[in-house]
Amino acid sequence: MKYLIEVIGETFLSISDPIDHRHWFLSKEQHAYEFIFMNLFYLVVIFIGINLNKKREYENQRKPKPIPEKDYPSLLNKIVAIILAINVFLNLIYKCLRGWRVVFFMLQPCHIVSTIYCYCLLTNNYQFGRKVFKISIYYILVTIAALVAPDLADLTLPFECYNFFIQHYALLIAPFLLQAYRYNIEFELPYALISQGLFGISHFFVFEIFCFISGTNINYMLFPPPLGEFSYLTQESYRVGIAFILFILALGIGRLVILIGSKIRSTFLLKNKSK
């Protein structure tokens, strides 16, 4: 294990291109340990989720097939999708204006989830869109975190701050619209686990590697966000600690969004359609 840690640490050192003095806030050994164990943890979570889902699907084969949920076409869905698409495009322009390194920030969850929600809001492939939504609904926690503690220090270009808030409020609204007007899913633990497993691997594998290559702090994988009075969170364990906190919170908040969206659907849409 010690040799493996050394090899991974040296690999990170060889591909890294620092542009900030905090680039090595965590040691190469710390990065290597977390790269191995956190990715293993999230792979196990995905494996459990997939197997639970297979078991659930097998059990459902024996039951009568439910009547498919009705999709209520909504102009609001299209408006929110267009807003998200425009925001992603504007963010890409902003990043390109700052140089090739900054373009890697397009991997940030807000931009990826914006693209996913655009697809879910507009796709004609209802069944696949439903599965994608079952996974992506739990990422609303990232949106909430960004709105509660917005990091606007680097947003200096015209309209960039406004664009940030417009995008994130659209991201906040989108899951409720998708639940109320389109998919009306239920909380399913297998999909919740797959969701969090993918989220974790995107950080501790994909973001980790691209952070070293570009030198940019994608979703704070190199060094912590400005935490103010909570400076004790900036110790070496901040990534692991926040990862597990988000893991638990995402399941609870995702479930709450499902319940609220279903309530909106049953209270307003179904009653209005029955009149």
Swiss-Prot record:
Any Pfam family hit: TMEM164
Record's GO cellular component terms: membrane
Residue spans crossing the bilayer: 32-52, 74-94, 102-122, 135-155, 157-177, 193-213, 240-260
Membrane topology: Multi-pass membrane protein
Family: Belongs to the TMEM164 family.
Function: Positive regulator of ferroptosis.
UniProt KW keywords: Membrane, Transmembrane, Transmembrane helix
InterPro entries hit by this protein: TMEM164
Gene: tmem164
Cellular compartment(s): Membrane
GO terms, biological process: positive regulation of ferroptosis
Source species: Dictyostelium discoideum (Social amoeba)
Name used for this protein in its record: Transmembrane protein 164 homolog
